[in-house]
Amino acid sequence: MLLFVLNAIFVGQSIANDVADMVKRADEYRLDSSSSKVVSKVTLFEHDQIDKTREYHVYTRPNRESLVVFKSAVEAGQKMLMLGDNYWLVMPKSRRPIRITPMQKLLGEASIGDISTLTWSDDYQATMVGTESIITQEKLSVDTHKLNLIATTKGASYQRIDLWVDVIKGFPIKADLYLRSGKLAKQAQFTQGEREGRLQVVAMTLIDKIQPAKKTIIEYQSIMPITLEDKYYSPAYLTRNSKLDL
């Protein structure tokens, strides 16, 4: 009996490790370096016509820390800082940073959390749901593992995520993103492409399930390993130095 129990525990732990590895592998297709500069272009479409476009430079580093620099003329001088579960918006003429949440919208369906957070493994605990054959954006049928991700941090953008990853490659295909209320907030679809000869997520399409005529596409135009000095991750420093060339 004891041997049976120990074997069951071992098998359960092995499955949990496998699922955690799947999430980390999916993360690597989105961000393959712990400290990086990500140039993101966000485009809002309505009835397949471009409505608005914005550009952001995102500086990420370990321990769930990100600095987002707003680069478009209409948002010039604005910055957003994420330090773990805490988020601040820094306005160019403000004397103090403004506390915000990761769900605050930037453009269309793209929220602060969608731009600043490029990994799942630091914020979620995953379990295996099963396998499904689904149709990709490219109209191809792909066998996937369906994973259920539950938030483990207060600053996670979504309480729950249903994530589908390619059985063979581990590439993320799509995700259903749920609010703390249990409501489906939006669906994300991931576009495959190559960056420096490697398969990567080159764009994420966010679809509003309530307003299907609208969609928001976040393009990851470039990702390069860069480490900023610690001072840039201080809300007080960002407030005092509104004109940073980043």
Regions of interest found by a model, annotated:
Residues M1-I9:
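Bacterial N-terminal signal peptides
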Residues F10-A16:
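Sec/Tat signal peptide C-region and signal peptidase I cleavage site
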Residues N17-S35, K41, I50-K52, G84-Q159, ...:
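Flexible, processing/modification-adjacent segments and terminal tails
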Residues V39-L67, K71-E75:
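N-terminal, post-signal-peptide region of Sec/Tat-exported proteins
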Residues V58-P62, G84-N86, M103-L107, T191-E194, ...:
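A short, sequence-level motif marking secondary-structure junctions
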Residues T60-P102:
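Mid-chain, structured segments of secreted extracytoplasmic proteins
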Residues L140-P235:
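Gly/Pro-enriched, hydrophobic low-complexity segments
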